[in-house]
A protein has these predicted regions:
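N-terminal Sec/ER secretory leader and immediately downstream segment
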Residues: 64-194
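Intrinsically disordered, low-complexity segments enriched in small/polar and acidic residues
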Residues: 36, 79-83, 308
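Hydrophobic membrane-insertion alpha-helices, especially the h-region
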Residues: 44-64
């Protein structure tokens, strides 16, 4: 979770982000296509599906920040919060006031309730940064680094959170796509135009941007998923025949999606320049929502095994990878 540059100002409320309704499939154009490995599991789709689930969480953690203030509550600058305090006193104060908005409190509360040792370690990091002169932007950056260090070793627990955990991660992915759509746009041209403007980047990554509420909500959800799966029994990551059939049905349905048809058509052309122009027009948000829509309709058991497969072994990766 990466939060933006330090700034002296405080944030303002942001609207809740609601993902658009799923794409309707009625009346979709019919195309004749060849399907590789038609009689068995499509490994490419499995990798893509698992990637949507796992990367969705990473995308959420990478979102920038905003402070949601309730009523007349005053948010004190961090330098005032820790003024004259020793390290232990600063930890107590920051537990209350580092992120005093509703989403920030919910995240810290979930962490303290489910992982008290990790909560204390995070407060150690925040206290050190605050007493070294860091403002809330600096604290948010520390939370971003800490989040990666927390999530990676807990991926196996998240992988045991079952079909509900699978759907929760898909919801996070849908919200992340909505954030991209609202902030920058979903085609290559729009994304490039957005990132090429330093003012846009500074605004999107600064303390007070629209994504803080989403980021804190996502962090709390990941903490709760890890807590839910921590004591759950292991889930088999071996696909069954019914899983292969369910996934192949989803693959065939996706082939009728407008964005994916455009992607396949562009890849099949011989003209490189024409391919690039076609690819730049593809709406990655619409394509992502189509994939999420299909994945949500997989059978309960398939979701469980797909999540277990997608997280298997990832908890052994270094946190910086």
């Amino acid at each position: 979770m990466s939060f933006g540059k330090r700034g002296a100002g405080e944030g303002h409320p942001a609207r809740s982000l609601l993902p658009p309704p799923p794409i309707e499939e009625a009346g979709a154009p019919v195309a004749r296509m060849k399907v590789a490995n038609a009689g068995g599991i499509d490994k490419g789709f499995i990798a893509l599906a698992a990637g949507v689930v796992i990367v969705s969480a990473g995308a959420a953690l990478a979102a920038p920040s905003v402070l949601d203030m309730f009523g007349s509550q005053q948010v004190r600058p961090i330098e005032i919060v820790v003024a004259g305090l020793d390290r232990n006193q600063a930890k107590v104060a920051l537990a209350r006031e580092a992120f005093p908005d509703g989403e920030g409190r919910a995240f810290m509360s979930a962490l303290q309730t489910n992982f008290p040792t990790d909560h204390d370690r995070l407060l150690d990091v925040l206290a050190d940064e605050a007493m070294d002169g860091g403002d809330r932007d600096a604290l948010l950056q520390e939370v971003g680094r800490w989040s990666v260090e927390f999530v990676v070793p807990n991926l196996s627990a998240i992988g045991r959170s079952g079909a509900d955990g699978f759907d929760e991660l898909l919801n996070i992915g849908g919200d992340a796509l909505a954030m991209v759509e609202k902030t920058a746009g979903c085609t290559a041209d729009k994304l490039e135009a957005f990132v090429s403007n330093p003012t846009n980047l500074a605004s999107a990554m600064s303390y007070g941007s629209d994504s803080y509420k989403f980021s804190m909500q996502t962090s709390a959800k990941l903490v709760n998923l890890a807590a839910r799966g921590r004591g759950a029994p292991p889930v088999s990551a071996e696909f069954r025949r019914e899983d292969e059939q369910a996934v192949m049905t989803a693959v065939m349905g996706l082939m009728m999606d407008e964005q994916i048809m455009g992607l396949m058509s562009a890849n099949g052309r011989g003209n490189f320049e024409g391919n690039q122009q076609a690819l730049r027009k593809i709406d990655i948000c619409k394509m992502g929502r189509s994939i999420i829509y299909k994945l949500k309709r997989l059978p309960f058991g398939t979701k469980e095994r797909m999540l277990a497969m997608g997280t298997q072994g990832l908890d052994k990766m270094p946190a910086g990878v």
